């Protein structure tokens, strides 16, 4: 089997994003469009045949970086990996962006400023551009955003109530101090000493990827879905 964009396929499958599953089937059959072209076309609501090489590159970063509930930070990481100049990108496409999503992104930026949160070194224009791309991708993927919410809710309730919870094909349950996620294959992902806090959210204990120390690690729906799709 062709394993191109395997994680994107798994996200679509767990989310039951039907239009995307159909697109993967058509592509594999040799009758469908390139998925990065299609990602851009769906987000910007333009004919897929009109997507240029540069626009495909935008679609590729959107597709690879936003599936796990990533936002501006994830897009910045992806852009760096593919040699994108986000300030130039903003200059090139800002005026073409849909005004509704631009206004939403502007309001989000004002909230970020008020909270003194991370802006990733971007100018206002570049931040709004990237956040708008995020919003366009999410609106084109309603089932995917739905599975993020379902996973978050199921994980939280499993910890709080200690009763099994389901999110699509996934089952969350507590076994002692461990949060277990039953995958569609029947295998389990396990998160030791899992707990939920109203302010911190979901956390568990594991080896931190940066410090290599055993410590408390915070997680959320997107990271849980990433673990699931990479298992």
Descriptions of predicted regions:
Residues 1-231:
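Conserved catalytic core of nucleotide polymerization and phosphodiester-bond processing enzymes
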